[in-house]
């Protein structure tokens, strides 16, 4: 299959495909739903590791039935998304010297620390690379670029100014100088904006 050529071309033994997008959101737009495109699985939480011999999809308990209906069992193993099951699968399928590729743009720091820890324990090399799916997804939908709209106070419950004032009170009480908000849904909530 095509993925074997990409693995060989990039000198990798396997590649990680998480569900999350560049904003690490649970609900991704169609243009960022890489896991769905490559596996057929349409749930909102999961991760796949694909290598030359086999592949796995990790999903949480909400999706154990759904993943078996949507993804081909002749190609994918199905596992629980728990850290222990991920460790077990990696230990059994990624031997010493294994080169495991990942796109740093769509892996959280928490996930990276987990992968780094198990890579060190098992002598696996983590390799930053371009996203495999993006290289082969020729009919990928366009990224959303709809206009930003104001979410009226009658829907949000509070205007931005009041939210900001309350947030500053909490920061002052906790003696915090600043707050970095990286999740887009939190930014939208604070600013009372939405988009499509």
Show which residues each predicted segment covers.
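Ligand-binding face of N-terminal immunoglobulin V-set domains in extracellular IgSF glycoproteins
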Residues: 100
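N-terminal accessory/capping or targeting/presequence segment of soluble
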Residues: 1-96, 107, 111-196
